[in-house]
């Protein structure tokens, strides 16, 4: 990724100015340089969503969502930039007219081939020809499923809070926000631009943080007995100790966490960033573990606030944050994030 960024190629404008090692062209370049025989022998390189539709139908079409957001396809111009691939060291892909990474780029929901092929149908126990649609990246599917509530997509930020987190902000025009991926055309809401941020570790950062504490084993046993995950057990415990969710911050007074165990995805775009815990004492009990959990949630909230502020500085305003994902369902989590960001957080109902 650093080698690619050193080129300063104009395509990088559409990934926030710096490409992330989480994206696919740095990964393919690594493969070429470190496992050249695999690179040379590979017939196709797929994002997961596209692999699944190919595996199911034999159709080699790629989703405009996957290739725009992770592969540097320029959807607003309906093309790959051959000069970019040649400059970064992947000239073969351009010379082959991009046959290995996608020549037919289509919208999510487009029917694939003739539906399920015989092999896939047998493996899944479904009829041959069952319709299969072109897919999306998981977080973007979560975004499209939530961002249209209330006053519509351009007024909401979708926040998919799971193991990692993704922020999805929809605009009518292209907005270039340094350190925030995009703008991507028609990658989530058709006909609109998408700015994508997030945190490389979110729910996973909380899990990592809690694992360091001496009381973690005891807490896990109690959570297991209660039949809930440890973070849920801690959140429930917090609510028994305060009059309202917003007051939970008092439990973590003097304790501060920057939970960037996997770097900063946005808006700093720094994969080398590290986590920080400040304010630790000699405490080893469940109350201190609870305080550490609250401080970690606040740290996640401050990281989300950084993204909102960076986008606001470039003219993007979000009236609401529409949250989805398993880590964002507890009322304590939603309230602490709302307080940190100064923006209302809403959650859609599932049926």
Model-derived features: positions:
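Active-site core segments that coordinate phosphate-bearing ligands/cofactors
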Residues: 2-62, 70-97, 106-351
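Dinucleotide-binding Rossmann-like beta1-alpha1 core, especially the glycine-rich loop
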Residues: 66
């Amino acid at each position: 990724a650093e080698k690619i960024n050193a080129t300063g190629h104009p395509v990088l404008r559409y990934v926030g100015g710096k490409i992330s090692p989480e994206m696919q062209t740095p990964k393919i370049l690594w493969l070429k340089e470190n496992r050249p025989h695999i690179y040379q022998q590979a017939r196709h390189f797929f994002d997961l969503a596209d692999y699944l539709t190919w595996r199911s139908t034999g159709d080699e079409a790629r989703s405009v969502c996957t290739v725009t957001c992770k592969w540097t396809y320029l959807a607003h111009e309906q093309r790959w930039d051959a000069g970019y691939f040649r400059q970064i060291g992947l000239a073969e892909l351009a010379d082959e007219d991009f046959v290995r990474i996608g020549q037919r780029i289509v919208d999510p929901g487009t029917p694939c081939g003739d539906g399920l092929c015989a092999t896939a149908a047998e493996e899944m126990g479904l009829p041959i020809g069952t319709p299969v649609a072109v897919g999306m990246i998981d977080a973007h599917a979560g975004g499209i499923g939530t961002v249209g509530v209330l006053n519509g997509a351009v007024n909401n930020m979708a926040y998919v809070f799971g193991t990692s987190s993704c922020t999805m902000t929809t605009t009518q025009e292209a907005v270039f926000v340094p350190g925030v991926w995009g703008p991507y055309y028609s990658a989530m809401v058709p006909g609109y631009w998408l700015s994508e941020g997030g945190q490389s570790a979110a729910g996973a950062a909380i899990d990592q943080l809690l694992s360091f504490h001496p009381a973690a084993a005891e807490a896990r046993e109690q959570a297991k007995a209660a039949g809930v995950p440890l973070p849920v057990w801690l959140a429930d415990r917090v609510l028994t100790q305060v009059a309202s969710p917003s007051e939970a911050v008092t439990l973590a007074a003097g304790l501060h966490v920057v939970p960037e165990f996997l770097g900063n995805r946005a808006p700093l775009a720094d994969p080398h960033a590290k986590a920080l815990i400040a304010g630790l004492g000699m405490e080893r009990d469940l109350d201190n573990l609870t305080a550490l959990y609250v401080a970690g949630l606040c740290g996640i909230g401050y990281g989300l606030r950084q993204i909102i502020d960076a986008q606001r500085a470039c003219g993007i305003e979000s009236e609401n944050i529409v949250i989805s994902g398993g880590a964002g369902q507890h009322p304590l989590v939603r309230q602490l994030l709302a307080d940190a960001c100064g923006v209302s957080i809403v959650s859609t109902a599932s049926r």
